[in-house]
Each structure stands twice: as structure tokens, then as C-alpha cells.
Design a protein with these regions (language model features):
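Sec-dependent N-terminal signal peptides
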Residues: 4-13
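Surface-exposed acidic/polar loop and edge beta-strand patches at domain peripheries
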Residues: 21-209, 221, 232-269, 282-402
Length: 402
């Protein structure tokens, strides 16, 4: 029965892909583990695109046993993710531009070496170096002790190895690649949330999509939260770089961020002693409830854009951490169901959502690497069309206090 449930969950993500080849890289149900593995367009006898997909098992230090999967498209992007770390994306490169950042954490840390409750619930930071981290799903946000327990920073899912991992490649052009995983947050008497993740990419393109299906497998309703913590450093982030998004309002996360409210749209150079500033946004969307947020370099010819649905992800957080390059010069663009306040505050302010027993919900995001001025201009035009003539409201008082 359990195996049937797993296969059924993965099947939700397979519909419409009849003419495709697939490979199971990991399966906890069947005891499958491919370890080091590779497939190439040449092996598949594809002549009009050149690409490869490779899984490697890492060794040494705290990355011992961690797995990474890399998609390499000769005329497009190189995308690297880690099944060991909740299917998080490590970095994306292409056209001389990178989406990602330089963390002091250099290894792909195996969660077996992380205690999430260390440093008063900040143990999550010991592995934090990814471009995209799923923060959730049982809870997310800053750590807090409540209800006789520690709600650690940004939840657990980013530190749970995937139980099922598969690769699928369409046999016909444009040869769409799909990397799927199943990540389980299951604790006796507490929670049974399972997330079927999917990354889809068409070789040669400058964008990819995430499609995640969260299912409550328990017999009782359960709360959930999610923040897609998406992080960008150099060469996109620099002095004079800009954050753009159509928003109804912006407010500082805390009193410290008040000092940066007037300059929320621009970034400083690496600055020693700079503490992080966080801003909360209420995003605007088009008639289909779609919106976009982006960080653009000073010259306006490089950037990273995220498109998402505001019904699925109704709030947006922007994290400025323009500290030194060694310490971590990075900004986060974070669509979510919640802001980054502790779950206790998010619950009080009615942003924590609930899934009924057996119910599923899904999240769809598209990431685009902008590598010329025309692409940047198109995103700016799209933001302006949604924003209209009304300027964002700047609210000086934080909506909550930790």
C-alpha cells in the first residue's frame, strides 16, 4: 500500500509525458540507489541538442555521502541540485552569469552532520549555501520556543534527504528534462506531510520551473508554511543593483530595517558590519494572479527573475545581507505563504495555512537568468504593467515584533 501511495504521488507529476525515458536514481521503497550515474544526449541519440545529466556522490568533511545532480546544457544553463538536502538548488550558471552566492559554508553538508536545535534553533545555518531552499513545510520562519518545543529556523524540509528521486527526458523535441523527488516530513503522532518536487528544464533555454505538490498523508488536518528562499550574490548583486517587483506595500521586518526603508529598492556595496535587513511586501499580480520579482545589476544587463502565483504564495520577503564577500554578500527574494516571523506570530496574524487529511496543494515558480539588457527591459516592462500608476505604500511600522 505504501509503495502504491508513493507511485501515485509521483504520477501526479508525470501526466502528459507519455513519450519519455525515465530512470530511478533513488528509491527507499525498493532499496534502489544508483550512486554515481550519468546520461547524455549522445547516448540518447539526440542530435539537435547537447546536454547531460549526472549524479555524483560527494566525499570528505561534512559533505560525506551527499549527492548532487547536475544538468548541463551546452547552449543553456547548468543547474545543480542536491537530493540529500531536500532537493534544494545549489546554483545555476549560464551565459557568463551565475544565480547563487558565496557562503562561508563551502561543502554540500549532509544533514546527518547538522543539529537543527543547536545555537538556540539556528543549526540550519550550518548547511546554508543554496540558491533555492525550501523553508517549511511543517513550519518556517525565525526560531521560537513554544508549545513545549523548539521551532527551529526555517523548518526541516531542506535538511531531509529525498526518499525517491527520478529523472525523465522527453524523447521528442524540445527534450524537456524533469528531475523529481519525494521528501517526507513524517513523525509518529505529529505530522505526515510529503512533498513531491519537480524541476523542469528545456535544454537551451534560460529559465526553469519548480512544481511542488504538498500532501497531508495523515488522518488529521495539519498546518503548513512555505518560503522559497531564493538567494543571489555577485555578479548580479553589486553596489547600485536594484530589486524590482510590483507591490501594493512594503514594510520593515523590524526596527533595524526601518533605517533602510527609503532605500529598499537598491543595494549597497559589500559593507563590513552590515547586519541583515528584511522587508515585507504585499505583491500585486496580473489578472491570472501571476507576478514577478527580480534583482537587476547596476548596468541593467544581468539579473535573476522569479515568477509565481499569488494565490499559492501570497506574500513576498526581500532579505538584504550586503555584508563582506567572505561573510556572505547576498540578497534573498522569498515568495511564500508566510513572512519570516516565528510561527507563533504568523499563526496569530492568520498567515499559517492548513491542509485537511488527504488534501494536496501545489506551488509553481519559474526562475529566469537574465543575461542581456533586452531581457532585463522586458521584465521591467512587465513589472510596470502590473504596478500601474500607483506607487508602493511605504509603511514605516513593522507589522509584528519578535
Amino acid at each position: 500500500m505504501k509503495k502504491t501511495l508513493v507511485l501515485s504521488t509521483l504520477a501526479l507529476l508525470i501526466s502528459g509525458q507519455v513519450c519519455a525515458k525515465s530512470w530511478v536514481l533513488t528509491s527507499a521503497e525498493s532499496g534502489t540507489e544508483q550512486g554515481n550515474w550519468q546520461i547524455t544526449s549522445q547516448q540518447l541519440k539526440i542530435k539537435d541538442q547537447t546536454f547531460s545529466i549526472e549524479q555524483k556522490v560527494l566525499h570528505g568533511g561534512k559533505q560525506e555521502g551527499s549527492k548532487v545532480i547536475t544538468i548541463i546544457s551546452k547552449n543553456g544553463l547548468t543547474i545543480t541540485l542536491s537530493p540529500t538536502r531536500g532537493m534544494n538548488l545549489l546554483h545555476v550558471e549560464g551565459y557568463g552569469v551565475r544565480m547563487g552566492w558565496d557562503s562561508p559554508v563551502k561543502e554540500v553538508v549532509n544533514p546527518a552532520f547538522i543539529n537543527l536545535e543547536s545555537r538556540n534553533g539556528l543549526g540550519w545555518l550550518e548547511g546554508f549555501n543554496e540558491m533555492v531552499v525550501r523553508c517549511g513545510y511543517e513550519w518556517t520562519g525565525h526560531p521560537v520556543t513554544a508549545d513545549g518545543r523548539i521551532y527551529t529556523l526555517h523548518g526541516k524540509v531542506g535538511n531531509i534527504p529525498a526518499s525517491e528521486v527520478s529523472v525523465e527526458i522527453s524523447e521528442k523535441a524540445p527534450y524537456e528534462i524533469r528531475i523529481r523527488g519525494l521528501v517526507k516530513e513524517s513523525t509518529f503522532k505529529k505530522v505526515d506531510l510529503q512533498t513531491a518536487t519537480e524541476l523542469s528544464y528545456i535544454p537551451g533555454s534560460n529559465s526553469f520551473s519548480l512544481h511542488d505538490v504538498l500532501t497531508n498523508h495523515a488522518d488529521y488536518d495539519h498546518d503548513y508554511q512555505i518560503i522559497y528562499h531564493s538567494n543571489f550574490g555577485t555578479p548580479i548583486l553589486e553596489e547600485g543593483a536594484r530589486f524590482i517587483a510590483p507591490v501594493e506595500s512594503v514594510s520593515p521586518f523590524n526596527d533595524y530595517a526601518k533605517g533602510g526603508l527609503k532605500n529598499w529598492q537598491t543595494y549597497a556595496a559589500p559593507t563590513k558590519g552590515f547586519d541583515e535587513m528584511v522587508f515585507n511586501f504585499k505583491p500585486l499580480a496580473d489578472s491570472n494572479k501571476q507576478t514577478v520579482a527580480a534583482v537587476i545589476n547596476k548596468a541593467g544587463d544581468k539579473g535573476a527573475a522569479i515568477s509565481f502565483n499569488t494565490v499559492q504564495l501570497p506574500v513576498l520577503t526581500m532579505w538584504k545581507n550586503t555584508d563582506t564577500l567572505k561573510q556572505g554578500y547576498v540578497t534573498g527574494i522569498e515568495p511564500g505563504t508566510s513572512y519570516a516571523y516565528p510561527v507563533t506570530i504568523e499563526r496569530e496574524q492568520k498567515r499559517v495555512k492548513s491542509l485537511a487529511a488527504g488534501q494536496s496543494t501545489h506551488f509553481d515558480l519559474t526562475y529566469t537568468l537574465l543575461h542581456n539588457a533586452n531581457q532585463v527591459a522586458e521584465v521591467e516592462k512587465h513589472v510596470s504593467s502590473i504596478q500601474g500608476a500607483k506607487a508602493p505604500q511605504e509603511i514605516e511600522t513593522p507589522i509584528a515584533k519578535e
